[in-house]
Curated annotation (Swiss-Prot):
Short name of one Pfam family: ABC_tran
Stored PROSITE patterns: ABC_TRANSPORTER_1, ABC_TRANSPORTER_2, CBIO
InterPro entries, per database record: AAA+_ATPase, ABC_transporter-like_ATP-bd, ABC_transporter-like_CS, ABC_transpr_CbiO/EcfA_su, ECF_ABC_transporter_ATP-bd, EcfA_1, P-loop_NTPase
Principal location: membrane
Chain positions recorded as ATP binding sites: G42, H43, N44, G45, S46, G47, K48, S49
Principal EC category: translocase
Protein role: ATP-binding (A) component of a common energy-coupling factor (ECF) ABC-transporter complex. Unlike classic ABC transporters this ECF transporter provides the energy necessary to transport a number of different substrates.
Family recorded in the similarity comment: Belongs to the ABC transporter superfamily. Energy-coupling factor EcfA family.
Record-given protein name: Energy-coupling factor transporter ATP-binding protein EcfA1
Source organism superkingdom: Bacteria
GO cellular component: ATP-binding cassette (ABC) transporter complex
Keywords assigned: ATP-binding, Cell membrane, Membrane, Nucleotide-binding, Translocase, Transport
Location in or out of the cell: Cell membrane
């Protein structure tokens, strides 16, 4: 059972961020906790991926604070940040630097000063968790999309971070691979990890403990999926992709809609012109 009286794993407090004159994040405040599976959703350009870059220290907030287990993120505590946060991207190819999968996982452990035996034990353990034991001697770039994502997950697990971010990590996968990764997110939450998924995937959202809805850089709704997505009409108001919204509403609450195809196209056009 999630206990939100404890210290937040990650906390945004009044955060602002912009590129030049274009504000991407506006007065953003929220907390996420260990043992919590959180989905961040919103239309393209709503600020979702900017959140992951701020969390991982790739971007610096221009106002407000971001804390990881109570410690404010800054350029002076990058090591602390890397010890607590892992991220799996949409396309993990750029993360692969080893000749084999085993080499790739081992690379991230080199700064930990483990013995060779300890490192081997960790690699074998995370490979088993991610279901890639038979891939350890393969070349990462020759694997399928789903296999690459599982290798990326194993590499993150080897470092044992408390917070794991999935940034659109299932969007390019086939249905079977998607199911595998989504189930893994749930398992990680059950192990006590704080799992943050930036996604458009309906099934991911319905399995989350909490959903954050972003719109034009603002957090406009948050809560349990059944509370946030309580009607098709509400979903349309917050400028999420409408086909996604309608199917999600039906999935979560059994909501149906009589909107026809032409109305749908017109509605999408009006929303995206705003």
């Amino acid at each position: 059972m999630l206990n939100t009286n404890k210290q937040a794993a990650a906390s945004f407090q009044g955060v602002y961020f912009s590129y030049s004159e274009l504000p991407l994040i506006r007065n953003l405040s929220f907390d996420v906790f260990e043992g919590e599976y959180v989905c961040i959703v919103g239309h393209n350009g709503s600020g979702k991926s900017t959140i992951s870059k701020l969390l991982t220290g790739l971007l610096k907030p221009q106002a407000g604070t971001i804390k990881i287990f109570g410690k404010t993120i800054s350029s002076e505590n990058v090591t602390y940040l890397r010890n607590h946060i892992g991220i799996i991207f949409q396309n993990p190819d750029n993360q692969f630097i080893g000749i084999t999968v085993e080499d790739d996982i081992a690379f991230g452990l080199e700064n930990r000063r483990y013995t060779r035996e300890k490192m081997k034990s960790i690699i074998e353990d995370v490979a088993q968790q991610a279901g890639i034991t038979e891939l350890l001697q393969k070349e990462p770039h020759n694997l399928s999309g789903g296999q690459k994502q599982r290798v990326a997950i194993a590499s993150v697990l080897a470092l044992n971070p408390a917070i794991i971010i999935f940034d659109e990590s299932t969007s390019m996968l086939d249905p079977k691979a998607k199911r595998t990764i989504k189930q893994f997110m749930v398992e990680l939450r059950n192990q006590g990890k704080c799992v943050i998924s930036i996604t458009h995937d309906m099934e991911e959202v319905t399995k989350a403990d909490k959903v954050l809805v972003m719109n034009e850089g603002r957090l406009i709704r948050q809560g349990k999926p059944k509370d946030v997505f309580n009607s098709a009409a509400e979903l349309q108001k917050i400028r999420l992709d409408i086909p996604f919204s309608l199917s999600l509403s039906t999935k979560v609450n059994g909501v149906t809609s009589t909107i026809d195809y032409q109305q749908l196209i017109e509605a999408i056009g009006k929303l995206w012109k705003k």
